[in-house]
Amino acid sequence: MSKKEDPAHASAADDQARVFPKFLELTADESRALLARHNVGRIAFSMNDRIDIQPIHYVFDGDWLYGRTSHGSKFATLARHSWCAFEVDEARDLFDWDSVVVKGHMELLDPELGSPDAYTRGLELMRSLVSGTFTEGDPAPHRSILFRLRASELTGRAARPGP
């Protein structure tokens, strides 16, 4: 056995290559695929000079994230300051994960005040996730506000174990 093949003679460079993870950027297509695979993420927004992060369920469609929320501080804040960020992760291990961050403006969907087509599309998508959305059998009737977030900025990152 040569020195190179003998584990007792492994070089420091070989040890580092085995130990250190690789960090990568995801392509836009990989980022969109990750968003499409999941339905729970976190929305981040500024409220009272602080950053707040809340979990939400969502459906991704093209360049839009559709979700629903309830009246309250998050809704009031986002109605006035619509710029926000959204993140979803897929973690398999400490150094084996994918993460996507979306930044953009949140738009409240109301068929009477805005685009009825956008509202209808959002409702269809949310019903594909929770069939009783906005019906008598809705499991979360307090979440009565439909919104969408345009993926104006999309950034994907990943970590992979070392070689």
Question: What function would you assign to each model-found segment?
Answer:
Residues 33, 48, 76, 94-96, ...:
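Generic marker of residues within folded, mature protein domains
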Residues 38, 53, 60-62, 79-83, ...:
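Short connector loops at helix/strand junctions that flank enzyme active sites
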Residues 2-22, 90-163:
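Charged, gly/pro-rich active-site loop segments
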Residues 16-42:
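Short, basic/aromatic recognition patches
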Residues 67-97:
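Helix-adjacent hinge/juxtasegments
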Residues 38-70, 86:
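Short beta-strand segments
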